[in-house]
Amino acid sequence: MSLFLDTARIEVKAGKGGDGAVAFRREKYVPDGGPAGGDGGKGGSVIFKVDEGMSTLMDFRYNRIFRGKPGEKGMNKGMHGRGAEDLIVHVPQGTTVKDNETGDVLVDLIEKDQEFAVAKGGRGGRGNIRFATPRNPAPEVAENGEPGEDKILLLELRVLADVGLVGFPSVGKSTLLSVVSNARPKIGAYHFTTITPNIGMVQVGYGDSFVMADMPGLIEGAHSGAGLGIQFLRHIERTRVLLHVLDMSELEGRDPYEDYKTINDELESYNLRLMERPQIIVANKMDMPEAAERLAEFKEKLAADLGPDKEMPEIFEVSGLTKTGLQGLLARTSELLAQTPEFLLYDEDELADETAYYGFEEEEKPFKVSRDDDGGWRLSGDKIERLFIMTNFDHDESVMKFARQMRAMGVDETLRSMGAKDGDYVRIQKFEFEFVD
């Protein structure tokens, strides 16, 4: 878990499907009742649901494992087991769910009451009523329930704010937020006072409002993890308008123009799309005696750097301490929000390319063969292991069915071509049997 409670690593395991039953009708006046074993019920899935009342991932610090319930077993008289209820896990709005191993984004949960099954429950095993044929009207075959999906997930929470305040530490972002909104951030005259994003609702005129977030201070190298690092930049991705706060006083001994360039370089290095957002320069602490002169120097350097062909960005002179210049800043910010659509976190073209690429990948082989240290053979792979788990070895016909499935998959032929001989041990998970050529 990160310092800012915006990431969490958890395990989700869906419920196993219920086992199918091997049973026969044994009723008076029904001498040839036939099979009557019902199917097992579906295992419970683990479903994430957006909860607008949550604002952090704090709950996942203490509860990291979420398990769905198994489905009921099949019963006699063809009765199927009851499916298990899904496990609903509430997450904050704005949570991004990633596969911890691959880093792939599974879902971006941004809509109210949005749901997504992060781990699907296993299907119930079929009872012997499903395997009756004219050649075998009374089969002693049933399947075990399919195991539920088991995943390690990485959760990331980005602040859902319309406007983000960015700038170096101690330039007055927290003070500014406190006087224009209902937020009450911690304020202090030292670096990194803000270590988590503070959010406030800003009212503009009658009925207009927007959410503003005081993003923790950035430093040079933040995109590669320097200082409090990349954690800060993650929070900026969802904002639509950036207010770049600069300290025009001499209290910190900083150069506003160098600060301005450094912060924008960090934003661009982390994600090029951050620079597509409208950005207003907020010249703060203009109540200080030397502020006007430093602002003039800043404008001169910026104009020289941009050249005659580029338009100067908007600059608003304010003082968070004396509350001057804020109404004009907020009104202009509200106008920009009305003109600016939401930004996608992930490029749709890139996702489309990935989808096309994966669509043409060769189908994964149903099994792999390797050698153990003692010379035995080991079979592995999702498909063959799933068949193994779903085979009920208490019944000879089920074992024979599993042997036929392996033969159809080409297991016997592959082992033979690799040099397996009569009497060699072949293992699947913890099960061991002898190879017969």
Curated annotation (Swiss-Prot):
The cofactor named in the record is: Mg(2+)
- Residues of the signal peptide: none
Key words, A-Z: Cytoplasm, GTP-binding, Hydrolase, Magnesium, Metal-binding, Nucleotide-binding
Domain OBG-type G, by residue range, is 161-338
Q: Which CDD domains match?
A: Obg
> InterPro entries per the record?
G_OBG, GTP-bd, GTP-bd_Obg/CgtA, GTP-bd_prot_GTP1/OBG_C_sf, GTP1-OBG_CS, GTP1_OBG_dom, GTP1_OBG_dom_sf, OBG_GTPase
Q: Does the keyword Protein transport apply?
A: no
Cystine pairings recorded for this chain: none
Q: Supply the name of the protein.
A: GTPase Obg
Protein encoded by which gene? obg
